[in-house]
């Protein structure tokens, strides 16, 4: 029995002492005046009576009622029922009411009445003051309190003849039962009657309707969020204008938390004066009036629930973990069925007529039942995870959190983890974990209804029925007697508060009330206490939680087969069948990723320990330790699956004998795991073992098990009693035992705990002390690092005390082991553990002190034992490891560091790792890493014995290293943590290595330093290309690039010194200039041939330099420059010639200028430059000042058809053309005084414009009226037959087309440029393409003859950043979290590499269009050596078929990249000075663009895709000197540019990549494209949209059998033995073999048919003893035979056969058959669209075309008999006319044949080249063609006569001369 009310208080309004606008509450009277002993009077009650503050009102408000809750220091709750009414203010009372205070007032109570506004100031006589009647009770009977206080108020207001003192006295003396379902009727002496019902079980909360109201106000989702927030200890704040609703909401939320009790701050109604409580750091559930909502806005970590608005606001910084699935969705569905039953019927065709909805009270219980089911599902089986540590004198119970989470597979679940770590669950364990107590509904539910709930999950109606059954029980608990007599309580009238004749509430007589209270107290003392006996029983445990399969196990869900493999392997180990065990070991290690296999291993090992088979030999010991380490490596610090618990007794049992008296146990080899350094693991293990021994203590010997059994899991057999059952029985018997027996049991339990503490001190010392105790740090410091890709040793973990540092912070764990010895750290760790577990287990202080004394001795003894073990273990013979495989080295390649044993680990690539991806497990591989002067090489063999004896090779050039990172990884064999290195290269290779344990840290560091030294040498002369095969003489110190270079005189001297050293040692020929054949232009000359090209002394002084003649020394330099690629190409293009007399017609628009021969104007330009004829050399110096790096515009290519020129330069300076354009429309005095450089620049550009034939006659206006339609015809090739030929106008301004993010916005969907017809008829003669940022604000004048085209281009740093992302996408360092093709494509897209390729192709194609339409283009971007080079190279490649040959592409690279100064050394970071800048793949990006074009036009390129990969590999490898240094100037300074000219070709090593390519091309067709069938004058227009681009396989391919295939000498492995060499008697073996894409080199093991036949032919020739024929000659002969055969059979013409030989979608849109020599063309068009084809219909146009155009019409394939062919005009014999003939140059027969027509089979004549004496330029004679340039004539002088020839243009003539001379030189 308990008092219904403890105190009655009368509180009234009083003025504030500081005189502020608000008043304060004053307690007028309280009864009883003296505090109860068991319940003191709560302080601050006047604040809670008026939570919004004590304020006056201008009118009478109706009375209000609410119940506030106060919590005392003992966490006991007091319920304060407050009834407030208003009385007029007496005139004598001082009232202070300022306007400011009134403005701030908003509401006086929770009822929501209006406040006094500032517009109606109240007179003192009109104000009303609040007065409150308060009942304070420990019981929650709100309705009784409302009725009782209402009765007192009614007596006062209505003036009833009842004594208030008597009523209040009866109220304070009334007693009611606490629980048990009893019913009591009370009366307060005023004719009233009230019935009080107590709940059946007081542990179940009483909610009335609060839960249902909460769901109605907030909804399902919001309430679930608040529920999770309260459980995970977040701050929850309710807002409402009603205090009663605030109280009900808080009550409802607490009811939902049952069976957990909320133990933090709980204030349903918080007074305004205490709002600062909201800033407390601890969790809370608080209700605040909505009037103070503004003051809660700044709370950053508080979840606000607005009851009136129905919203829940969660701050961004707060994360509420949701319920784990499927509980979240299941709970939501059941709540929907309860709250909205009509939802299930809404879609029925014939819904039932009526649905009976539950009452509000019953719905409240149904909602609570849903959450009760939720907790039963969440906590099912929790009693099986309780550890009973002590039974007497009081139960001590601990919860095994890790086992509970592990059973459910919810270790990673944030919600459940936080719930189990919270204070509410700790209270739940201490309260409900007791085995012998009273039970309630939750205990029955979790013990007996779990199976039913699981069966009902898929049946919603059965779930709802169960919910209703539980709701009935909850309702019956609150209302045990349904038929309750009605209350009878006097109520005041409805408008009683408005009466004016109110009298104030009277002062009560204290004496009367106190007398009534004293009388009742005296009666209570004499009566016996009526206490209902509590029914206690054994709490049922219910079924154990069945093991849930690991949710994240993926492919490792263990099957019976995997467990069988584990058992077999262990059997083989203990039976000594080590070879069989070794074969099974990799499969076992993979299977041990699953929990079942790990438990199986522990069980099998335990069986062998029981059979006394724990002493092993060395090999058995190693196998067992490896399997244990594999088990433990996946154990978290929690050990949620009990694997470490099961292995702990085993690691102290298995051992091996090292020597007599010295035994090594397994624990010394499994210490490197984080679980051993986790205090929670040791505590759980300790409590589990103590429970086992306590249980054995109380079991009869016949019932139990021996105390020596080690248990990690609870026993679940039906015939055995659990520890909780034993404890329950003992607690039941405890009161019946004698005092002595009780004391004996207490001592036995304490002795058990004490002995286990000693036992665990020993165990912990075993696993914490390292084998080598002399180490200065603990082994555990490295545990748990995993495969972190950083060199940091810091540990970061979320698990509590999961690391050394964190465990120290949580009052356990190691201190910083660097500052103390190992023994001291272990002693402190063990002492903290002992303190914690012994204090919690109730061990006496004496025993605890004894333990502290014993721990240091235990540790010291173990250290002494370990010293002997460590000493003997060092004497063990080392495990025999695989023999190191020596790598194959290049000639001249030397080993810098011999092999260091490493493991090559799998990176993020899926190939080669086996498993689910398929294929053999080639990685991880065991071997060694070698560092040579050229490469980093790994050679080894896979660790998986099932793969076989496959050699794994992975290497890359040292110069290609881009990133080196130290990592810490687990070795794949012994699962130990080792230091490692991750090396990434720009050749798209990755070496992820873990050093073997025998490799010391010093050796690893030496390897890293040597690698760094080789990667970044101090000088370029220390690179492999220079040190290979030559001992160069050290020159002067390396030039510092930042210095201002030497003077012109010094530079000239240096240049001449190097030129004389390399060229001058040969005599200078005095013959006229005869250009060498194209076959030998770029090669060192034959040994017996002089290789000088001299400029004759007959030079005219005014032809090359406008001011003075060349000096003799300059002429030697000039002759060297003439040989360079630039000059050779200029002569081919007709841009300028250095003929015998160097005389040029003045009509030639361009000339070769030697102004930069000493590199005085621009060091990054070549020595000879093409400039307009009219520009003098002295003006070029001034022009160069307008451009960055002095790189002024020079011509680099000229269109043979439109005569438009392509120019390149650096970006413009501010005073260049930009300045002119900005000021051109506003004349001013400053404009007249323009800078001379700008004027010279303007003249220069004007000269370029004037050099174009069709613009030369125009007077400053680019009117194109004379521009014929023939020039607008399409002469290009599209990359698809289906290309649309729609004409698409792009607006009137090229600049606006190019400007913007997407550069060109064309309507073509595939990214193709518009057709030629898109250009407007009136366009500029010259387009200057520049950077948009540089040309910002420029408005070109349409009257100008050039036009600026501002575009947005990427910078070098963007290329570098994009390349880094591309590297990580193609060669990731670690496996993707979601391995799928989409993840690779997403990474590829994020790199933006293909977007940059797209932009480059798009700009290039547009420039091609402009050039093809007759406009010249100047590309002037950045400094002119990166993007500019990429664009101009691509433009020439697309426009000129010559550059698509092997020789032409070489010439293109030499000219545009090498001679024009691309900074290869700077962009490739070749030296230490460039280390900070890093690698920028500008040239590689260009090669990728060429690869994209090659894919779309495979028949237009003479070279193969492999050639591009070869260049991409070797431009970074530094094997050759070709791609070193930044300009010709630097190469001359080092003496490199001409050094190969004087050397002989017989050397072993090639210094030039081109020489290497030439040598290989003669031996193998690897660089040749068999589908090569070019069409001259083809302008390629590739599609450039990202969707049309492909990822280059250079980035992704892998050849683990031999490494990268780009070093040909290394890629050629030993030949396979012939079939006849099989051993005698051997069975015939199949020649079939498995080809692994990531292992084998597919071109070698699966060669294409042509290569295979060529190899076979060569082999047969060798067998027959015949000299082998070159493959190219064989191929040419085969093609000629094919052509001859097709001609004889009449199956078609050669050109059509060539087209049909390859997929025709790669061909042009038209196929042409020539009917006569220059006659009309018959078009067989594949598409009717004329704008996309290459057709012409007029023979007049055909006659005017260049020779290359005619060549495409007469084209056939190359053959043995047709080395070169084309049309030449030949003058007949004496007095015979000139006539066009078809000439064929035959290298094989060494003759020049001519035919009347191309199709003729019989020749008209033959010129034997053996009789030719000279080939010289000729002069026109009578009857020669009129339209041909005089330089197109040449003569062939033989021993018999002189033949006069005429080509159709100068380049064709030069080509014929070169070809004929090439044949002569080869003879």
UniProtKB/Swiss-Prot annotation:
Residues with N6-methyllysine modification: 1222
Domain PH: start-end pairs: 1761-1865
Modified residues (Phosphoserine): 1120, 1746
Major location (coarse): cytoplasm
Composition skew (Polar residues), residue ranges: 705-715, 1260-1269, 1281-1290
Domain dDENN: 338-439
GO biological process: regulation of cell growth; spermatid development; spermatogenesis
Sequence segments annotated as region (Disordered): 102-121, 702-725, 1065-1092, 1260-1318, 1605-1633, 1723-1752
Cellular component, GO annotation: neuron projection; nuclear body; perinuclear region of cytoplasm
Modification Phosphothreonine, positions: 1137
Positions of the GRAM domain: 880-968
Compositionally skewed regions (Low complexity) per UniProt: 1723-1750
Matches recorded under Pfam families: DENN, GRAM, Myotub-related, PH, SBF2, uDENN
UniProt keyword terms in alphabetical order: Cell projection, Cytoplasm, Guanine-nucleotide releasing factor, Methylation, Phosphoprotein
Record-linked CDD domains: PH_Sbf1_hMTMR5
Description of the deletion phenotype: Viable. Approximately 30% smaller than wild-type control animals. Males are sterile. Significant increase in the proportion of bundled axons with a diameter of >1 um. Significant increase in unmyelinated axons that are in 1:1 relationships with Schwann cells. Significant decrease in the percentage of bundles containing between 11 and 20 axons. Bundled nerve axons were incompletely enwrapped by Schwann cell processes, as evidenced by direct contact of axons with basal laminae. Number of axons per bundle not markedly changed. No impact on Mtmr2 protein levels in sciatic nerves.
Every uDENN domain range: 7-184
Domain Myotubularin phosphatase stretches: 1120-1596
SUPFAM superfamilies listed in its UniProt record: (Phosphotyrosine protein) phosphatases II, PH domain-like
Gene Ontology terms for molecular function: guanyl-nucleotide exchange factor activity; pseudophosphatase activity
Entry's localization field: Cytoplasm; Cytoplasm, Perinuclear region; Cell projection, Neuron projection
Function: Acts as an adapter for the phosphatase MTMR2 to regulate MTMR2 catalytic activity and subcellular location. Promotes the exchange of GDP to GTP, converting inactive GDP-bound Rab proteins into their active GTP-bound form. May function as a guanine nucleotide exchange factor (GEF) activating RAB28. Acts as a suppressor of autophagy in neurons. Together with its binding partner, the phosphatase MTMR2, plays a role in dephosphorylation of phosphoinositides critical for autophagy initiation and autophagosome maturation.
Entry's free-text remark on domains: The C-terminal domain mediates interaction with MTMR2.
Family membership: Belongs to the protein-tyrosine phosphatase family. Non-receptor class myotubularin subfamily.
Assembly mode: Heterodimer with lipid phosphatase MTMR2. Interacts with SBF2/MTMR13; the interaction seems to be independent of the coiled-coil and PH domain of SBF2/MTMR13 and independent of MTMR2. Interacts with KMT2A/MLL1 (via SET domain). Interacts with SUV39H1.
Name used for this protein in its record: Myotubularin-related protein 5
């Amino acid at each position: 029995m308990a008092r219904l009310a403890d105190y009655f208080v009368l509180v009234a309004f009083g003025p504030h002492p500081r005189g502020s606008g608000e008043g304060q509450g004053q307690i007028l009277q309280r009864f009883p005046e003296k505090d109860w002993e068991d319940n003191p009077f709560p302080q601050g009650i006047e604040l809670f009576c008026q939570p919004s503050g004590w304020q006056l009102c201008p009118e009478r408000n109706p009375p209000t009622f609410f119940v506030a809750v106060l919590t005392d220091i003992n966490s006991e709750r007091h319920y304060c029922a407050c009834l407030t009414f208003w009385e007029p203010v007496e005139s004598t009372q001082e009232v202070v009411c300022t306007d400011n205070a009134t403005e701030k007032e908003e509401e006086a109570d929770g009822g929501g009445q209006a406040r006094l506004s500032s517009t109606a100031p109240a007179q003192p006589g009109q104000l009303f003051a609040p007065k409150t009647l308060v009942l304070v009770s420990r019981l929650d009977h709100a309705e009784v309190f409302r009725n009782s206080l209402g009765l007192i108020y009614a007596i006062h207001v209505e003036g009833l003849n009842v004594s208030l003192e008597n009523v209040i006295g009866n109220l304070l003396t009334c007693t009611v039962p606490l629980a048990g379902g009893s019913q009591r009727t009370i009366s307060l002496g005023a004719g009233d009657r009230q019935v009080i019902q107590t709940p059946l079980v007081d542990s179940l909360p009483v909610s009335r309707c609060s839960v249902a109201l909460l769901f109605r106000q907030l909804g399902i989702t919001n309430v679930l969020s608040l529920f999770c927030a309260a459980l995970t200890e977040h701050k929850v704040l309710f807002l409402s204008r009603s205090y009663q609703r605030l109280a009900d909401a808080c009550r409802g939320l607490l009811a939902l938390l049952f069976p957990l009790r909320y133990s933090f701050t709980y204030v349903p109604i918080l007074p305004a004066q205490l709002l600062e409580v909201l800033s407390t750091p601890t969790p809370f559930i608080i209700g605040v009036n909505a009037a103070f909502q503004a003051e809660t806005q700044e709370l950053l970590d508080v979840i606000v629930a607005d009851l009136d608005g129905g919203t829940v606001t969660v701050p961004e910084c707060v994360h509420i973990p949701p319920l784990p699935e499927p509980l979240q969705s299941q709970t939501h569905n059941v709540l929907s069925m309860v709250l909205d039953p009509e939802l299930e019927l809404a879609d029925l065709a014939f819904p039932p007529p009526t649905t009976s909805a539950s009452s509000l009270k019953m719905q409240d219980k149904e909602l609570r039942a849903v959450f009760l089911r939720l907790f039963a599902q969440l906590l099912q089986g929790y009693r099986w995870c309780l550890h009973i540590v002590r039974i007497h004198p009081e139960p001590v119970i601990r919860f095994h959190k890790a086992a509970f989470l592990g059973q459910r597979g919810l270790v990673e679940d944030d919600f459940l983890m936080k719930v189990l770590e919270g204070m509410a669950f700790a209270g739940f364990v201490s309260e409900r974990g007791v085995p012998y107590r009273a039970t309630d509904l939750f205990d029955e539910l979790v013990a007996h209804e779990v199976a039913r709930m699981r069966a009902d999950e898929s049946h919603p109606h059965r779930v709802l029925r169960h919910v209703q059954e539980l709701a009935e029980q909850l309702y019956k608990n609150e209302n045990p007697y349904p038929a309750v007599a009605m209350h009878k309580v006097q109520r005041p009238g409805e408008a009683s508060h408005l009466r004016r004749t109110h009298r104030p509430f009277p002062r009560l007589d204290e004496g009367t009330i106190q007398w009534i209270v004293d009388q009742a107290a005296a009666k209570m003392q004499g009566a016996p206490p009526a206490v209902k006996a509590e029914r206690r029983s054994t709490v049922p445990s219910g079924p154990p939680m069945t093991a849930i399969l690991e949710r994240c196990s993926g492919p490792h869900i263990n099957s019976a087969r995997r467990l069988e493999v584990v058992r077999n392997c262990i059997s083989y180990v203990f039976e000594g069948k080590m070879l069989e065990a070794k074969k099974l070991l990799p499969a076992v290690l993979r299977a041990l990723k699953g929990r079942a296999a790990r438990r199986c291993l522990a069980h099998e090992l335990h069986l062998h320990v029981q059979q006394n088979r724990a002493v092993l030999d060395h090999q058995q010991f190693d196998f067992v330790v490896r399997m244990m380490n594999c088990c433990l490596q996946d154990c978290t610090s929690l050990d949620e699956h009990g694997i470490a618990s099961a292995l702990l007794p085993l690691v102290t049992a298995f051992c091996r004998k090292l020597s007599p008296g010295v035994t090594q146990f397994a624990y010394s080899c499994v210490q490197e795991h984080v679980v051993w350094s986790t205090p929670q693991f040791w505590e759980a293990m300790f409590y589990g073992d103590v429970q086992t021994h306590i249980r054995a203590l109380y079991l009869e010997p016949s019932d139990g098990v021996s105390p020596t059994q080690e248990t990690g899991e609870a026993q679940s057999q039906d015939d055995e009693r659990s520890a909780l059952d034993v404890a329950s029985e003992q607690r039941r018997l405890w009161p019946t035992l004698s005092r002595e027996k009780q004391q004996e049991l207490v001592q036995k339990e304490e002795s058990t705990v004490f002995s286990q503490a000693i036992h665990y001190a020993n165990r912990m010392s075993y696993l914490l002390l390292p084998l080598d105790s002399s180490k200065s740090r603990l082994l555990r410091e490295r545990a748990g690092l995993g495969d972190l890709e950083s060199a940091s040793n810091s540990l970061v973990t979320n698990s509590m005390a999961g690391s050394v540092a964190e465990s120290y912070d949580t009052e356990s764990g190691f201190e910083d082991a660097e500052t103390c010895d190992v023994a001291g750290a272990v002693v402190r760790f063990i002492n903290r553990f002992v303190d914690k577990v012994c204090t919690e287990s109730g061990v006496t202080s004496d025993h605890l002190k004894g333990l502290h004394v014993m721990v240091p001795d235990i540790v010291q003894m173990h250290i002494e034992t370990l010293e002997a073990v460590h000493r003997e273990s060092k004497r063990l013979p080392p495990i025999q490891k695989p023999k190191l495989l020596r790598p194959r080295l290049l000639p001249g390649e030397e080993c810098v560091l011999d092999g260091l044993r490493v493991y090559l680990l799998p990176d993020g690539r899926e190939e080669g790792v086996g498993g689910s991806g398929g294929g053999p497990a080639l990685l991880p591989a065991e071997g060694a890493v070698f560092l040579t002067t050229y490469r980093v090489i790994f050679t080894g063999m896979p660790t998986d014995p099932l793969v076989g004896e496959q050699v794994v090779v992975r290497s890359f050039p040292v110069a290609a290293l881009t990133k080196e990172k130290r990592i810490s990884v687990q070795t794949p064999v012994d699962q130990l943590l080792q230091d490692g290195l991750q090396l990434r290269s720009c050749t798209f290779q990755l070496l992820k290595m873990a050093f073997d344990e025998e490799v010391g840290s010093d050796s690893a560091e030496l390897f890293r330093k040597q690698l760094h030294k080789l990667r970044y040498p101090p000088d370029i002369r220390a690179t492999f290309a220079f040190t290979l095969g030559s001992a160069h003489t050290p020159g002067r110190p390396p030039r510092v690039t930042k210095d201002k270079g030497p003077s012109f005189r010094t530079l000239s001297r240096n240049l001449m010194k190097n030129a004389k050293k390399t060229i001058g040692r040969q005599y200078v020929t005095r013959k006229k200039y005869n250009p060498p054949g194209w076959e030998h232009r770029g090669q060192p000359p034959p040994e017996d041939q002089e290789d000088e090209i001299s400029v004759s002394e007959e030079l005219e002084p005014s032809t090359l330099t406008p001011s003075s003649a060349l000096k003799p020394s300059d002429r030697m330099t000039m002759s060297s420059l003439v040989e360079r690629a630039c000059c050779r190409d200029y002569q081919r293009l007709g841009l300028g010639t250095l003929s015998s007399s160097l005389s040029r017609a003045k009509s030639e628009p361009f000339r070769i200028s030697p102004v930069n021969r000493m590199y005085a104007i621009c060091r990054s330009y070549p020595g000879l430059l093409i400039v307009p004829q009219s520009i003098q050399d002295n003006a070029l110096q001034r022009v160069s000042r307008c451009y960055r790096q002095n790189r002024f515009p020079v011509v680099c290519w000229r269109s043979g058809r439109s005569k438009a020129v392509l120019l390149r330069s650096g970006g413009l300076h501010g005073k260049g053309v930009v300045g002119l354009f900005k000021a051109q429309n506003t004349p001013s005095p400053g404009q007249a005084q323009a800078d001379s450089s700008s004027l010279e620049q303007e003249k220069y550009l004007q000269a370029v414009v004037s050099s174009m034939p069709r613009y030369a006659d125009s007077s400053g206006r680019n009117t194109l009226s004379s521009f014929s339609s023939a020039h607008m015809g399409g002469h290009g090739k599209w990359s698809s037959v289906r290309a649309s030929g729609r004409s698409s106008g792009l607006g009137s301004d090229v600049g606006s087309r190019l400007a913007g993010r997407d550069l060109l916005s064309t309507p073509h969907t595939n990214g193709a440029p518009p057709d030629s017809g898109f250009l407007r008829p009136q366009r500029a003669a010259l387009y200057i393409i520049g950077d948009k940022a540089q040309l910002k604000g420029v408005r070109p004048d349409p009257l100008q003859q050039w036009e600026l085209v501002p575009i947005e281009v990427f910078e070098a740093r963007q290329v570098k950043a994009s390349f880094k992302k591309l590297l990580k996408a193609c060669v990731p360092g670690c496996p993707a979290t979601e391995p799928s093709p989409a993840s690779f494509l997403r990474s590829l897209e994020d790199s933006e590499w293909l977007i940059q390729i797209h932009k480059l192709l798009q700009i290039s194609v547009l420039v091609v269009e402009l050039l093809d339409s007759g406009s010249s283009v100047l590309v002037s971007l950045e400094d002119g050596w990166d993007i500019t080079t990429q664009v101009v190279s691509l433009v020439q490649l697309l426009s000129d078929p010559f550059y698509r040959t092997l020789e032409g592409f070489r010439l293109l690279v030499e000219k545009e990249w090498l001679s024009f100064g691309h900074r290869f050394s700077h962009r490739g970071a070749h030296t230490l000075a460039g280390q900070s800048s890093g690698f920028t793949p500008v040239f590689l990006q260009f090669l990728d663009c060429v690869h994209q074009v090659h894919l779309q036009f495979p028949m237009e390129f003479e070279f193969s895709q492999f050639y591009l990969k070869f260049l991409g590999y070797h431009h970074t490898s530094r094997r050759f000197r070709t791609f070193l240094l930044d300009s010709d100037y630097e190469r001359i300074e080092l003496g490199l540019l001409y050094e190969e000219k004087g050397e002989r070709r017989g050397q072993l090593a090639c210094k030039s990549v081109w020489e290497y390519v030439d040598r290989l091309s003669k031996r193998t067709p690897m660089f040749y494209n068999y589908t090569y069938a070019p069409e001259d004058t083809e302008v390629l227009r590739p599609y450039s949209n990202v969707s049309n681009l492909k990822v280059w396989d250079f980035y992704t391919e892998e050849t683990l059998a031999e490494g990268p295939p780009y070093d040909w000498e290394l890629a050629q492995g030993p030949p396979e033995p012939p079939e006849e060499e099989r051993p005698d008697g051997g069975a015939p073996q199949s020649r079939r073999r498995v080809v692994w894409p990531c292992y084998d080199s597919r071109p070698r093991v699966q060669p294409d048919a042509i290569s295979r036949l060529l190899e076979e032919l060569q082999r047969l020739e060798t067998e027959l003893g015949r000299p082998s024929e070159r493959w190219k000659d064989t191929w040419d002969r085969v093609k000629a035979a094919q052509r001859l055969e097709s001609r004889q059979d009449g199956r078609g013409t050669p050109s059509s056969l060539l087209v049909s030989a390859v997929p025709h979608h790669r061909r042009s849109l038209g196929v042409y058959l020539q009917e006569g020599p220059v006659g009309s063309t018959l078009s067989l068009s594949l598409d009717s669209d004329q704008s996309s084809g290459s057709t012409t219909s007029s023979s007049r146009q055909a006659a005017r075309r260049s020779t290359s155009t005619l060549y495409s019409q007469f084209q056939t394939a190359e053959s043995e008999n047709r080395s070169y062919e084309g049309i030449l005009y030949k003058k007949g014999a004496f007095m015979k006319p000139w006539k066009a003939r078809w000439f064929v140059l035959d290298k094989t027969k060494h003759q020049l044949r001519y035919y009347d027509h191309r199709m003729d089979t019989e020749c008209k004549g033959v010129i034997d080249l053996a009789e030719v004496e000279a080939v010289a330029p000729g002069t026109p004679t009578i009857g020669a063609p009129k339209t041909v340039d005089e330089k197109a004539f040449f003569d062939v002088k033989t021993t018999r006569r002189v033949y006069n020839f005429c080509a159709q243009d100068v380049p064709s003539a030069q080509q014929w001369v070169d070809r004929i001379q090439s044949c002569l030189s080869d003879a």
